[in-house]
């Protein structure tokens, strides 16, 4: 079964739909919006940024070559049309006419080439360099940017929609010191680190992003982000009217959701996925039946409704919803379902039960909602004869620790939880191809499938991704839990309308008005 939605790639050239002359009613007065954040950006260079907080800011000032709709399909962006050669190695992007950089200079194919060249330059130290794929050469032919790859790379179009693939203007790097000059909906005004970032609407902006309704410049004239680290202080600022929007805690979001004076926004298109995984090289987790029993014991509905206040959804696939080829109904036929009775039977067959429990570690890291989920999970496992002792670490230390744990072939078995995000299911390659993320890679057969999907496109690639997902699910290497899962909440006063959150937890203010 292949989902009907697919990338508009292939031999034919994809062309943008004309915006036409639809009339939009714009507010007749200047509208300012202030947003309180817990953490500041660590930089405003999209080709060097690595944190969500930084990329959320760069996404407001810089555009991408392509865009993605909520169904995972790829659409025009800075490129009004694009095509792929028959061998899948050469991409041609026609740069849209009339695009202006924030300083008034023209953004054309030469500017686009310069941006790609800088992103690929090792001296840039781009944390997302590998995601650009095997680009061999870049060239310009009139209005067309040509990118030639050494081999086909299926995720390429999806990556070019992501906030990590933003295009900068040449004037950004003129003179040596980086200046945030892009083509995006907002222009840089000022930045005082760990205090405030001020932006203003780009009067020349023309939107083609399918997630946005407003065809022109944002309704918001001035957009200010204030850093308020303390959650109590952020909420006080929201309730007093000092700010219009905040990053709420999970508990605060639940309270605000019940109050008509406020609105809560969850990043449904986050591309985030929460998984449970195993130290599968250590007995008895080398036995797929034991892994399946663990998965059957996990009550994902309870995790969503109790630990996450009903603000997230349960997941069936090892890839996040809304991404290319994701089919939650199909994945549900491959994976385990909540069935503690069947789980007990599998454990009993392996010799485990109340009088002889399987002792394991539940290795986790600290995040809002996750802590309570792990406590419920511990109870779920106890109900089938598994004695799970929770060990909690900070995020950075956790993944360093897991790299060592997953390399072991003996010792105490462990279940561990993690999250992954992206705009394409190719992150399966990052996770599972040997040696894999924190040494969780599997085997040569999986490696081969992961390599093959990168060289395919359209229905053929979707079928290969489904084959990979089916293998992971039927062998219970991954237990999908919930989506989304971190940094995915925003709240505003009821006076704010039109705010959206896009892929990779991007913040979309183009349609925002304030009464």
Labelled PLM ranges:
Residues 32-33, 192-197, 297-326, 368-380, ...:
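Detector for C-terminal structural segments
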Residues 37-86, 117, 181:
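N-terminal lobe/hinge region of extracytoplasmic solute-binding protein
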Residues 40-55, 78-79, 105, 127, ...:
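A structural "hinge/loop" feature
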Residues 80-125, 143-146, 284-286:
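Aromatic- and charge-enriched surface segment that lines or borders ligand/interaction sites
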Residues 160-224, 232-233, 341, 345:
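Gly/Pro-rich hinge or "lid" segments in bacterial periplasmic/extracellular proteins
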Residues 186, 313-349, 367-372:
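Structural transition elements
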Residues 208-256, 387:
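Ligand-site clamp/hinge motif
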């Amino acid at each position: 079964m292949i989902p009907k939605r697919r990338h508009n790639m292939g031999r034919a050239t994809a062309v943008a739909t004309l915006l036409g002359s639809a009339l939009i009613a714009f507010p007749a007065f200047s509208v300012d919006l202030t947003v309180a954040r817990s953490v500041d950006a660590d930089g405003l260079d999209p080709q060097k940024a690595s944190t969500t907080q930084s990329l959320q800011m760069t996404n407001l000032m810089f555009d991408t070559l392509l865009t993605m709709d909520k169904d995972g399909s790829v659409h025009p962006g800075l490129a009004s049309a694009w095509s792929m050669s028959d061998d899948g190695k050469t991409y041609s992007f026609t740069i849209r006419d009339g695009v202006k950089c924030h300083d008034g200079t023209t953004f054309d194919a030469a500017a686009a080439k310069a941006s790609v060249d800088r992103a690929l330059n090792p001296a840039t130290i781009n944390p997302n360099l590998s995601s650009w794929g095997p680009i061999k050469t870049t060239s310009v032919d009139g209005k067309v940017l040509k990118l030639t790859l050494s081999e086909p790379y299926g995720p390429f179009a999806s990556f070019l929609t992501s906030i990590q693939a933003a295009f900068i203007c040449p004037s950004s790097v003129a003179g040596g010191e980086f200046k945030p000059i892009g083509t995006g909906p907002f222009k840089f005004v000022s930045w005082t680190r760990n205090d405030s970032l001020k932006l203003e609407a780009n009067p020349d902006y023309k939107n083609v992003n399918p997630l946005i309704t407003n065809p022109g410049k944002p309704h918001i004239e001035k957009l200010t982000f204030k850093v308020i680290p303390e959650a109590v202080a952020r909420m006080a600022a929201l309730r007093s009217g000092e700010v219009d929007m905040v990053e709420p805690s999970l508990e605060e979001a639940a309270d605000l959701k019940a109050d008509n004076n406020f609105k809560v926004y969850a990043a449904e298109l986050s591309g985030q996925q929460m998984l449970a995984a195993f130290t599968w090289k250590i007995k008895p987790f080398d036995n797929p039946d034991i892994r399946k029993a663990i998965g059957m014991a996990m009550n994902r509905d309870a995790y969503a409704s109790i630990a996450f206040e009903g603000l997230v959804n349960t997941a069936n696939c090892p890839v996040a919803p809304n991404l290319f080829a994701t089919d939650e109904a199909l994945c549900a036929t491959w994976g385990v379902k909540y069935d503690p009775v069947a789980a007990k039977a599998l454990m009993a067959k392996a010799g485990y039960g109340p009088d002889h429990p399987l002792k394991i570690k539940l290795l986790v890291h600290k995040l809002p909602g996750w802590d309570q989920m792990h406590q419920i999970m511990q109870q779920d496992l106890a109900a089938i004869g598994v004695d799970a002792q929770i060990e909690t670490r900070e995020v950075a230390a956790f993944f360093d620790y897991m790299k060592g744990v997953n390399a072991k072939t003996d010792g105490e078995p462990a279940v561990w939880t993690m999250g992954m995000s992206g705009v394409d299911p190719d992150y399966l390659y990052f996770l599972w191809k040997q040696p894999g993320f924190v040494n969780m890679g599997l085997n040569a057969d999986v490696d081969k499938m992961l390599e093959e999907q990168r060289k395919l496109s359209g229905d053929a690639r979707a079928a290969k991704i489904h084959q990979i997902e089916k293998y992971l699910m039927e062998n219970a290497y991954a237990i999908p839990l919930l989506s989304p899962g971190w940094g995915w909440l925003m709240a505003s006063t009821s006076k704010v309308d039109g705010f959206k959150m896009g892929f990779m937890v991007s913040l979309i203010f183009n349609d925002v008005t304030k009464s």
